From Swiss-Prot:
GO terms for molecular function: 6-carboxyhexanoate-CoA ligase activity; ATP binding; magnesium ion binding. This is 6-carboxyhexanoate--CoA ligase. Pathway: Metabolic intermediate metabolism; pimeloyl-CoA biosynthesis; pimeloyl-CoA from pimelate: step 1/1. NCBIfam families: bioW (TIGR01204), PRK01322.1 (NF002360).
Amino acid sequence: MQEETFYSVRMRASMNGSHEDGGKHISGGERLIPFHEMKRTVNSLLEKGLSHSRGKPDFMQIQFEEVHEPIKTIQPLPVRTNEVSSPEEGQKLARLLLEREGVSREVIEKAYQQIISWSGVRGAVLFDIHSGKRIDQTKGKGVRVSRMDWPDANFEKWALRYHVPAHSRIKEALALASKVSRFPAAVAELCWSDDPDYITGYVAGKKMGYQRITALKEYGSEDGCRIFFIDGSEDVNTYIHDLEKQPILIEWEEDHDS
């Protein structure tokens, strides 16, 4: 079915040296594209890394590689926007949504106690809903979800239909959350950006879909969060491998939602 060759394109940028040398993370990006979109994609990732509000990078890496695994096409998670008047209200709602998705109050509390210490983690923290402990062994690196994308034309059609801003930030976040939630080990995801100018975050899961929350932190804060609450009784190593290596394209079909 899939005739065209696709490429995984990745960007990471940091300040005061590379990430491995202790540099401050500035920006990252993931795309999955056919070759004819390469130049435009690399240029847009370059622009993203150079113009980030977290600072001016002095290290950047952009790499691409051909994807040999078959690409799976999935639907985006259903989206709901929750308007809140403060980060406190937003965080209260986030905890409630996590609980509804199957994470116990005790485990949510254990995760929240450690969020500040994880703010420098570049990828995601994997947190087991049974033991209430972090179970990925990646330390400051975190688990980086890769090889997913949402072709622009299809995303713009979806955004128009649901009256959502056709912003690349929403496209990237929803593509990632849709990939993350599709595997058996996934229970729920809690995320907000490390961008000081962006305070909207989300909670996502198989049952509730993608729940945007308009304030999960104060403006000016560079502390981000990405926690995957997972069922540790499932095969966690396979889950991590799939998050990093399984290529996924989002393709919204209107009649799928009706």
